[in-house]
Amino acid sequence: MLNNKKVAFIGAGSMAEAMISGILAKKLLQPQQIYVTNRSNKEKLLLLQKQYGVATFRNYQETLPKMDIIIFAIKPKDIAETIEKI
């Protein structure tokens, strides 16, 4: 079902990491199918990249059009600001 699908996570906190970990543990996706970004914590992105082998990105306009699924793993208060960037 998710073969060859590319999934972007907007947000790289605990919620995103739990989903990524579960998705990879269940082998629903391969690490190269997962892309992650966040607002400002570059260290967290590097940690996720190193720990899970996922890709990271900073440019929404370049990356998101290539995605099949976009998951907002952010706090409700940050949704409006994030959607404006897209």
Task: Report the location of each language-model feature.
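Rossmann-like NAD(P)-binding element
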Residues: 54-85
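NAD(P)+-binding Rossmann beta1-loop-alpha1 motif at the extreme N-terminus of oxidoreductases
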Residues: 1-51, 55-58, 62
